[in-house]
């Protein structure tokens, strides 16, 4: 198969290729011109408001700031940058794929989307590693889990994400077809296909494996603590549920789209086409909006399941409730988990040392 004939769009935003087959596939999806503008508008309004409130509540909250809050603020900023580009895509979907806002915004908006995708995945990975260190290795990780280290890590993530977005910036162009403008990707070359495959593996599937591994280790440690204590600790049981909810939300949001993208790249590298381009394109069109919606749901997830953030948001919106402490009975912050697991680990170490001394 000649890569020049590859018709499946390989970047993070799917339905903008000038290939006639793509336009035909896109036009046969009935919901795009009606449902997507409405859906993206709702995502834009709720996401912009939610992420602004989340950033403001954590940034201006008096007192000490949790280490995890630094990552959450950066994640909200990354989502916010993506969300401000959504009105451009609302206009594109409403105009049946036409791009009416010029070449600069064609390249710039696609670049910001790519930066957001990489930044979000890397930040989620760092948050998972941070929680792993805080819960599983609380004593050893004290010298690493510092505020200055968190800021350096976040700055590095932004820098790397901006570099990884450059291929998207260079491969995008405003193309005229039948005197109609389309924000499109250039023809796929063998080098681009290989780069897309390597980038997808190392910027999604490897971080995904890291996230799942970290949370599995955390869940194992929590279960061990629960069995060791022999108490029905509702806080720890709820913490395990939250861990799986976070992982499940990440998987539901991103795994379908990136799986179709992986199949598209592999199909483009094969001599024979094993997967129809129309099927892969349709899969990315259906799963793409689900992935993008993740940018607006994160503030609500944190508000519902993290009582620390819930209090910060309520105190930010209603300063009169500053002295009213609620939700403490369902606290699920990392500080609670760290204290509980630290006690458990110290008890385990003490038991081992005692057994060793007795045996000697």
Curated annotation (Swiss-Prot):
Q: What's in the GO CC field?
A: endosome; plasma membrane
PTM note says:
Phosphorylation is necessary for YWHAE binding and efficient surface expression. O-glycosylated. Sialylated O-glycans in the N-terminal tail inhibits binding of GPR15LG.
List the ranges whose topology is Extracellular: 1-33, 91-120, 171-192, 261-284
**InterPro entries associated with the record:** CCR1-9-like (IPR050119), GPCR_Rhodpsn (IPR000276), GPCR_Rhodpsn_7TM (IPR017452)
Q: Name one GO biological process term.
A: angiogenesis
Q: Could you list the residue ranges that cross the membrane? A: 34-54, 70-90, 121-141, 150-170, 193-213, 240-260, 285-305
Which SMART domains does the record associate with it? 7TM_GPCR_Srsx
Q: Which GO terms describe its molecular function?
A: coreceptor activity; G protein-coupled receptor activity; virus receptor activity
Q: What does this protein do?
A: G protein-coupled receptor that plays an important role in immune homeostasis. Acts via its natural ligand GPR15LG, a chemokine-like polypeptide strongly expressed in gastrointestinal tissues. GPR15-GPR15LG signaling axis regulates intestinal homeostasis and inflammation through the migration of immune cells. Controls thereby the specific homing of T-cells, particularly FOXP3+ regulatory T-cells (Tregs), to the large intestine lamina propria. Also required for skin localization of thymus-derived dendritic epidermal T-cells.
Q: Which family does it belong to?
A: Belongs to the G-protein coupled receptor 1 family.
Q: How does it assemble?
A: Interacts with adapter YWHAE; this interaction promotes ER-to-Golgi transport of GPR15.
What is the name of this protein?
G-protein coupled receptor 15
Q: Which gene encodes it?
A: GPR15
